[in-house]
């Protein structure tokens, strides 16, 4: 039995085209190019995220449209660097909690090109930063440490990277100093909870 057999009948399952399921492109082709009109209230559910599970099992958190609008406005006005249609960002944090989801919504809100990674791979992250002239990224300290441990890290081009957002766990002064030395950009410590949308 597959996961799709367990889902309610009114559930649409979109995959990369495995047997019996629609590929995203096929599903999209079945619908009009213009989105349907919708009346959305600010307190309507926008996204269900999950807590990190720091104090127990992860818990579901329903965030509203106004939660994410406020987060996006705050991020775009508090950020010392611009983010718009002429910039790029990388998302390598999981999308089930605020670190990844907040970065994704910020990218959509600001209009910047957003590169989504299925999983964190430090070498691929660095390649994307170079090739796509990435200006900002969110990483937890463990990710920053993994990037810094790449053998050729000092030879890589981070000239377009203007800010690294980090959080979710403490970072040592040694790691932070090394990261600033290598990336040569602003580091912005984030603190928030999924329950408060950041």
Where are these regions (language model features)?
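Short beta-strand->loop structural element characteristic of the AMP-binding/adenylate-forming
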Residues: 1-2, 59-62, 91, 113-120, ...
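ANL superfamily adenylate-forming
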Residues: 2-42
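Adenylate-forming
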Residues: 27-28, 51, 68
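Conserved pre-ATP/AMP-binding loop-to-beta segment of ANL
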Residues: 31-50, 57, 82-88
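Short hydrophobic/charged patches on amphipathic alpha-helices used for structural packing
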Residues: 37, 123-126, 145, 153-155
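Conserved S/T- and glycine-rich ATP-binding loop of Class I adenylate-forming
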Residues: 45, 51-54, 62, 89, ...
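Conserved AMP-binding/adenylation subdomain of ANL enzymes
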Residues: 69-88, 96-136, 150
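Gly/Ser/Thr-rich phosphate-binding loop
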Residues: 109, 134-139, 148-198
């Amino acid at each position: 039995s597959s996961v799709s057999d367990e889902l309610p009948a009114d559930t649409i399952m979109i995959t990369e085209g495995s047997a019996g399921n629609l590929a995203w492109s096929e599903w999209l082709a079945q619908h009009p190019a213009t989105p349907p009109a919708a009346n959305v209230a600010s307190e309507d559910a926008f996204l269900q995220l999950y807590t990190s599970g720091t104090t127990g099992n992860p818990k579901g958190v329903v965030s509203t449209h106004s939660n994410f609008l406020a987060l996006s406005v705050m991020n775009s006005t508090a950020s010392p660097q611009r983010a718009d249609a002429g910039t790029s960002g990388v998302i390598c944090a999981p999308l089930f909690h605020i670190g990844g989801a907040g970065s994704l919504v910020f990218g959509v809100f600001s209009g910047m090109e957003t590169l989504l990674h299925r999983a964190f791979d430090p070498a691929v992250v660095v390649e994307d930063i170079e090739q796509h002239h990435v200006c900002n990224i969110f990483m937890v300290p463990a990710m920053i440490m993994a990037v810094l441990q790449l053998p050729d890290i000092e030879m890589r081009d981070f000239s377009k990277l203007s800010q690294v957002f980090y959080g979710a766990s403490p970072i040592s002064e040694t790691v932070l100093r090394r990261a600033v030395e290598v990336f040569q950009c602003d580091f912005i410590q984030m603190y928030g909870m999924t329950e408060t949308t950041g």
